[in-house]
Design a protein with these regions (language model features):
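Hydrophobic alpha-helical transmembrane segments
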Residues: 1-3, 25-37, 67-80, 115-129
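N-terminal juxtamembrane cytosolic/stromal segments of multi-pass membrane proteins
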Residues: 1-55
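Selective transmembrane helix interface/packing segments
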Residues: 2-5, 9-12, 16-20, 62-63, ...
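Membrane-interface segments at transmembrane-helix boundaries
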Residues: 23, 103-127, 158-163
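Juxtamembrane transmembrane-helix termini
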Residues: 34-37, 66-73, 112, 155-165, ...
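Membrane-helix interfacial "entry" motifs
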Residues: 37-41, 45, 73-89, 112, ...
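Hydrophobic alpha-helical transmembrane segments in multi-pass membrane proteins
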Residues: 47-70, 80-104, 123-153, 170-190
Length: 190
């Protein structure tokens, strides 16, 4: 049975392809990563991360402003802070995904062997980042981070590098702990 081509982000149809990727990652990640080619260009995955980061940053700013408004404490400083946080989230998302890919590559090289490259792991992480489209929703955001950087990365690593279940769990946890710690640290700075 021939494998279908995985829907990847395309500059020709950015919104349609972004929805296809997010739908594939959120609702059928095993199928998405089963047919995923880790080797490929970085431009489209990076722009996908920027798009998801921009949407999430914007919606996060809207939620923060609505929350402040509902408590009657909306001032110019609150608006400036929400806009700046949303903008920084959007612009720094590709950097954060790159750092996460570095942690996962270190775990892969430690527990799997000398396989993979930073570019391959970045592509896996970039599309897993699509789950963070839900990050702006209070409470759901914590689950979205865990789903993206533990579950989806585990599925991606298992599918691309053909690792055993236990190796996948160890690699996913070894990569997730520093990624989550860094995210908590950065979030508490703001």
């Amino acid at each position: 049975m021939p494998s279908k081509r995985v829907p990847e982000f395309s500059l020709e149809h950015p919104l349609a392809s972004a929805f296809a990727v997010i739908r594939g990652v959120l609702f059928s990640p095993k199928i998405f990563y089963r047919d995923f080619e880790a080797e490929g260009p970085l431009k489209e995955p990076t722009l996908f991360v920027l798009l998801v980061g921009a949407v999430t940053g914007f919606l996060g700013a809207v939620v923060a402003l609505a929350s402040n408004l509902s408590f009657g404490e909306l001032g110019l400083g609150d608006v400036w802070s929400a806009v700046l946080e949303g903008l920084l989230f959007a612009l720094l998302s590709p950097v954060y995904v790159g750092i996460a890919a570095g942690f996962y590559l270190l775990a892969i090289r430690t527990f799997v062997g000398k396989v993979g490259s930073l570019e391959e792991v970045y592509r896996i992480a970039a599309y897993a980042f699509g789950a963070l489209i839900l990050f702006w929703i209070p409470v759901v955001g914590a689950f979205a981070v865990t789903y993206a950087f533990m579950i989806l990365m585990g599925i991606g690593i298992h599918s691309v590098y053909r690792t055993s279940f236990i190796t996948t769990v160890v690699v996913a946890l070894s990569g997730f702990v520093p990624v989550a710690t860094a995210l908590i640290f950065v979030t508490t700075l703001g």
